[in-house]
Amino acid sequence: MLTMSTLVSNPLFELSEVSVGQHFYWNLGGNEVHGQVLLVSWFVLAVIIGFGLTANSNLKPTPDGLQNLSEYVTEFIRDLAKTQIGEEDYLSWVPFLGTIFLFVFVSNWSGALVPWALIELPSGELAAPTNDINTTVALALLTSIAYFYAGINKKGLGYFKRYVEPAAFLLPINVLEDFTKPLSLSFRLFGNILADELVTGVLVALVPLVIPIPLMLLGLFTSAIQALVFSTLAGAYIGESLEDHH
């Protein structure tokens, strides 16, 4: 006889335990912060810093190994910044775009490659920092601050004339556009990474060995694309704030 207890004990119904929003909280200065996000973020920063120090500790005229990879990544980010911002101003923004790209890229891949679920926490579980909306909103707000700074630094208060160009009645639309940019950046990245991890988790629970492997490879690809999209849009917004409007 099929009883409620039988249904609840069925492994298929364990899929319902896949949930969003469970966190391991730290109390810092009377404020609760997501401890698991900070832990994995520190891991991501350690990987990036460790890679940079190791790859550039013994530079050779003919690069090989990690130095070769480091120079390839640097050239890639320089080209991205040059394309989006323009040849005149791009150099000063390479470090910012490089930091954004590497942090998002390594964060996304850490969620796909590192078995965080094996590390037990009092509550919640470790995951990619970009799996938390607070992280993606923070990155988007940093991008917003960057393109406002870029425009004001180059044009002074004249930067704000763009809101009434080419006609004053466009002011509300232009202001709204600047508010929607960080929203679209943050929710696009958060939604894609969260969806990828949830789908992978469900399929691993259903078919642990075969089906998840190609899906995980696809997840690595989409994670890299999301890092590229985020940094490309950040560069495009900065370039837009720097260009002359006539």
Swiss-Prot record:
Q: Can you say what this protein is called? A: ATP synthase subunit a, chloroplastic
Q: List the disulfide bonds.
A: none
Keywords in alphabetical order: ATP synthesis, CF(0), Chloroplast, Hydrogen ion transport, Ion transport, Membrane, Plastid, Thylakoid, Transmembrane, Transmembrane helix, Transport
User: According to its record, how does it sit in the membrane?
Assistant: Multi-pass membrane protein
Q: Which residues cross the membrane?
A: 33-53, 99-119, 133-153, 201-221, 222-242
Quote the function comment for this protein: Key component of the proton channel; it plays a direct role in the translocation of protons across the membrane.
Q: What family is this?
A: Belongs to the ATPase A chain family.
Q: Where in the cell is it found?
A: Plastid, Chloroplast thylakoid membrane
- Cross-referenced InterPro entries, in alphabetical order? ATP_syn_F0_a_bact/chloroplast, ATP_synth_F0_asu, ATP_synth_F0_asu_AS, F0_ATP_A_sf
Q: Which organism is it from?
A: Oltmannsiellopsis viridis
In the UniProt record, the signal sequence range is: none
